[in-house]
A protein has these predicted regions:
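Short loop/turn segments that flank or connect secondary-structure elements
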Residues: 1-43, 47, 53-166
Length: 166
């Protein structure tokens, strides 16, 4: 059951989430500088901006953020928080949105290797990534999941719930 509206995020969880965002943003800046000759992302590029769901913690933080009204909504699959192909919640965007455009490294435990997911506008399919080029999200996702569990426990909702961005 989803309480409507979702209860506010306690300050301790909000502060820890802010620290998580800062840590991720620092790494993103480092990787973006390292890969700047490949990154084509710029304001107005919304190729990666799709309609998806987020954890209750991030949904609550986004819902409490000031944002301009959305004047135009893209297609059925495009993120509803875009206005003229620009993010209306850019400063408060979820973690997954912050990582778009960079090469994401995932540990494939079955095959004991690292799989890479990268924007085709930035990197060719056979781009020779080095380990230091990759954004490894597992440590950040573990922290996000722990914060979400703490919030959901206090809010009395299921931690595995996913909510659409609106």
């Amino acid at each position: 059951m989803i309480p409507a509206p979702l209860p506010p995020v306690p300050n301790t969880i909000r502060d820890e989430y802010g620290a998580l965002v800062l840590d991720l943003d620092r790494l993103i800046v480092t990787l973006s500088q390292r890969l700047r000759s490949f990154i084509n992302c710029a304001p107005g590029c919304s190729s990666c901006c799709r309609k998806f769901t987020v954890l209750p913690l991030e949904a609550t933080l986004i819902a409490g953020s000031p944002r301009p009204s959305v004047r135009s909504i893209g297609g059925e699959e495009q993120c509803p928080l875009l206005d003229d192909n620009r993010c209306t919640i850019y400063q408060q965007r979820p973690l997954i949105c912050r990582t778009q455009g960079l090469p994401i490294g995932y540990v494939d435990e079955t095959n004991e290797q690292i799989e890479v997911s990268a924007c085709p506008l930035n990197f060719s399919e056979d781009h020779p990534f080095e380990y230091d080029d990759l954004l490894l999200l597992d440590p950040f996702n573990f922290r996000l999941a722990a914060l979400n569990r703490a919030y959901c426990q206090k809010a009395g909702i299921a931690a595995d719930l996913r909510l659409p961005l609106e």
